[in-house]
Swiss-Prot record:
Protein source organism: Conus radiatus
Signal sequence, renumbered to the chain: 1-20
Record-given protein name: Alpha-conotoxin RVIIIA
Biological role: Alpha-conotoxins act on postsynaptic membranes, they bind to the nicotinic acetylcholine receptors (nAChR) and thus inhibit them. This toxin provokes a nearly complete and slowly reversible inhibition of both the human adult (alpha-1-beta-1-epsilon-delta (CHRNA1-CHRNB1-CHRND-CHRNE)) and human fetal (alpha-1-beta-1-gamma-delta (CHRNA1-CHRNB1-CHRNG-CHRND)) neuromuscular nAChRs.
GO cellular component, one term: host cell postsynaptic membrane
Family indicated by similarity: Belongs to the conotoxin S superfamily.
Length: 93
């Protein structure tokens, strides 16, 4: 009888720990959706029109970017590992 109660206690304890871990995972996913969304937009630049952003240097990038939807774009100098130069960057706000 005692071994059955012990086994039930262990199962209950494991179930409680598993459900609290799952709850923590859900909370972790809820905390940073806006920051993740901004990071993806800034990295991908898919919503920007790259053709209109032209310039010759760090301070010579034009301000003529256009974005789709509610996003705003700015033309800025981008230093990348593959290519540096003026680029449109999308922002969420």
């Amino acid at each position: 009888m005692m071994s059955k109660m012990g086994a039930m206690f262990v199962l209950l304890l494991l179930f409680t720990l598993a459900s609290s871990q799952q709850e923590g995972d859900v909370q972790a996913r809820k905390t940073h959706p806006k920051r993740e969304f901004q990071r993806i937009l800034l990295r991908s630049g898919r919503k920007c029109n790259f053709d209109k952003c032209k310039g010759t240097g760090v301070y010579n990038c034009g301000e003529s970017c256009s974005c789709e939807g509610l996003h705003s774009c700015r033309c800025t100098y981008n230093i990348g590992s593959m290519k540096s130069g003026c680029a449109c960057i999308c922002t969420y706000y």
